[in-house]
């Protein structure tokens, strides 16, 4: 398989994972808001705290809009798979229902490797569609930025670990 095809597959998997990442960010904002609210519970809240809570509420609404948009985008892409196919079912479980691979194995029922093979086949099937290929190519730059950020974060964590343990 050529490198370009592998990259398209990686980009498509990243696009399909947008719902999960958006939901995780929303969850993180909710946790921060709860922590701040708990710290100031029962205390007359200064204007600064109220403003911060209002800002967090606004961020949660924006993040929910991103989650909703990601769900629609994922559903639109998955629609290109054959209607009653196992590949479509696995993609829906993974990217719409956000099920773990263990949960998918049980729901289908198949082994993890069989589920993964079917999932990878679904990705290849999707990339046979011109519109899906176009979407993947349009998002490639954002995907590359995402990978670059992950790489930089990994290097930073490694550097901090080396400092901590005096290597």
Which residues make up each language-model segment?
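DNA-recognition helix of helix-turn-helix
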Residues: 109-132
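N-terminal interaction/assembly modules
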Residues: 1-80, 124, 128-167
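Short, solvent-exposed positions on alpha-helices
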Residues: 88-89, 113
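Helix-turn-helix DNA-binding module
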Residues: 97-114
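Short helix-coil-helix linker/hinge
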Residues: 80-88
